[in-house]
Amino acid sequence: MVVIRLARGGAKKRPFFNIVATDSRNRRDGRFIERIGFYNPVASGAEESVRIAQDRLAYWQGVGAQLSPTVARLVAQAGKAAA
């Protein structure tokens, strides 16, 4: 099953997450199919904290990909900020 979830990057004590479409059996930071966006939890000031390619997200959901609970929350947050 394809899932859309966060893959951690960044440095120690400076987390940065890529929002990726991947097979559910792969490791958290392992191989992925496509990078859909990013989430920067330590963004400050004018820095962008969340970016999601809505067209690719809609495509993956259309073919049956499931969102992780955290990604679902970030999608709702990004939608609210865009409106």
Curated annotation (Swiss-Prot):
The keyword Lipid metabolism does not apply. GO terms for biological process: translation. Keywords: Ribonucleoprotein, Ribosomal protein. The keyword Nucleus does not apply. It holds the Pfam family Ribosomal_S16. GO terms for cellular component: cytoplasm; small ribosomal subunit. This is Small ribosomal subunit protein bS16.
